[in-house]
Design a protein with these regions (language model features):
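Active-site mouth loops of central-metabolism enzymes
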Residues: 105-117, 185-202
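Histidine/acidic residue-rich metal-binding segments in metalloenzymes
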Residues: 148, 198-298, 322-341, 389
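Histidine/acidic-residue-rich catalytic or RNA/ligand-binding cores of hydrolases
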Residues: 101-103, 146, 175, 226-229, ...
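His/Asp/Glu-enriched, well-ordered alpha-helical/loop segment
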Residues: 251, 255, 324-409
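Metal-associated gating/positioning segment near the N- to mid-region
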Residues: 80-157, 173, 240, 272
């Protein structure tokens, strides 16, 4: 796919976006100061709710926060009424290039320019739902097309969250998410980049770095299966191979995230020192201990499991998926008790973009307090994305990424599913 094709796709999309939804237009931050006022403001670091709350914004940054702030001459005052202001939300596990439906068919039937348009619309939907920063965990066959989407957002040409991108995930031949079951004589586009050895891993990582990847995503385990009446998951890369990947990523100034469930794959990932283990269930006590010791983030992704359970093809499959969800919930409580660091990621894409705030509700349902979930999302999420001290808190010097919800999310976390105001970088996208 050429750069020219991607640019044509993005320009065409930008026209559609601006006509269809003027509130979603990308724009530069205004030159005049803005004062945001609301009944409540959440200090995520302390858990304290400031009543009332005000934020002074100049350009794309926060200047002052408190019960009252300066109102410089020429300021625009936005009164958000009986709402709570908090930092823009973070989703640490998304797929902009996916939509509901069979993933293999999307790769086979949809061109990369078409999927890039889909991704840009998804980015807008996520932003309008209050997600001002996200980590895209693989284009699933669209290569480095996410680079163009990220750059267009950064340049203010299209609306969307701040993005950390990975390009395609890295996979072994015949591994998880590979296009299996097709005529072997028919060329089918792979959903990931293949690497079967440590040397091949390093070569693929260098190519992805060249193409603009912010981090590396590796499939460390395959699909769950039942063996001897128990859930089991095969690993794909050895500890030595993952260590080589983590070492090379560090040399490139990047970090490694792994898709991993079960043993020994999750243990290999923890021993290698990856940045996050996504999905993160069926963990041994040793893996849990290492994750706490090395501060490796667990990203549970409950919402995708719930979605698959609720939309299973047969009642039997639905029952199995719901059983797996309960297993995940038990594992989650064990990880919370062990103080494993958590981040919030939904795996949105296979279910509709803009609906992923359901993840907050499920994490509370399965054992965390609303404040703990918000701290995991905003403080840990900012750290995982490499933007700590830039996003994730409402403090002077941070980017002016602010959302507002009705009521108090510490009392009713489901209010995060009803974001009514969105500012990113000093630009109001929704009010």
């Amino acid at each position: 796919m050429t750069t020219r094709i991607l640019l044509i796709a993005l320009v065409s999309l930008s026209l559609v976006t601006f006509v269809a939804d003027a509130a979603g237009q990308a724009a530069a931050a205004p030159s005049h100061p803005i004062v945001l006022h609301a009944a409540r403001l959440l200090d995520v670091k302390t858990g304290r709710t400031v009543k009332p709350g005000e934020i002074l914004v100049q350009g794309d940054h926060i200047v002052e926060v408190g019960t009252t702030v300066k109102h410089p001459g020429g300021s625009e005052v936005i009164d958000l009424g009986d709402r709570t202001m908090l930092p823009g939300l973070i989703d640490a596990h998304i797929h902009l290039f996916l939509h509901p439906g069979a993933e293999d068919l999307q790769t086979v039937q949809e061109s990369v320019p078409q999927r890039t348009i889909t991704a840009t619309l998804a980015a807008r939907d996520d932003l309008m739902a209050g997600f001002t920063a996200e980590r895209d965990m693989g284009t699933e066959g669209a290569g480095s097309a996410d680079t163009a989407v990220r750059n267009a957002i950064d340049e203010g040409r299209i609306p969307g969250p701040r993005l950390r991108i990975s390009g395609n995930a890295i996979n072994i031949l015949g591994g998880h998410e590979d296009a299996i079951g097709y005529n072997p004589e028919q060329r089918v586009l792979p959903n990931a980049n293949y690497a079967n050895t440590a040397d091949e891993l390093i070569a693929v990582m260098r190519q992805q770095f060249k193409e603009g990847a912010d981090f590396i995503k590796i499939y460390e385990t395959g699909a769950d299966s039942v063996r001897d009446g128990k859930l089991a998951t095969s690993y794909q890369y050895s500890e030595a191979q993952l260590e080589a990947a983590v070492k090379e990523a560090a040399r490139l100034g990047r970090r490694v995230a792994v898709h991993a469930t079960g043993e020994p794959g999750t243990l290999f990932a923890a021993q290698a020192g990856v940045a996050s283990i996504d999905h993160a269930d069926q963990l041994s006590d040793e893996t849990v201990r290492l994750m706490k010791e090395k501060q490796i983030f667990a990203v549970p992704t409950f919402t995708i499991f719930e979605y698959f359970a609720d939309h299973a093809a047969t009642p039997e499959q639905g029952a199995r998926e719901h059983q797996m969800l309960e297993v995940k919930a038990q594992e989650f409580r064990k990880q919370i008790a062990a103080r494993v660091p958590m981040a919030v990621g939904s795996d949105v894409g296979p279910f509709p973009h803009g609906t992923q705030a359901r993840e907050f509700v499920l994490m509370v349902k399965y054992g965390m307090s609303p404040l703990a979930v918000l701290q995991a999302d905003l403080l840990n999420g900012a750290k995982l994305l490499g933007w700590e001290e830039q996003i994730g808190a409402l403090e002077p010097g941070y980017f002016a990424d602010v959302v507002a919800v009705p009521g108090d999310p510490l009392q009713d976390v489901s209010s995060l599913q009803n974001v009514q105001f969105v500012m990113k970088g000093g630009v109001v996208y929704k009010k």
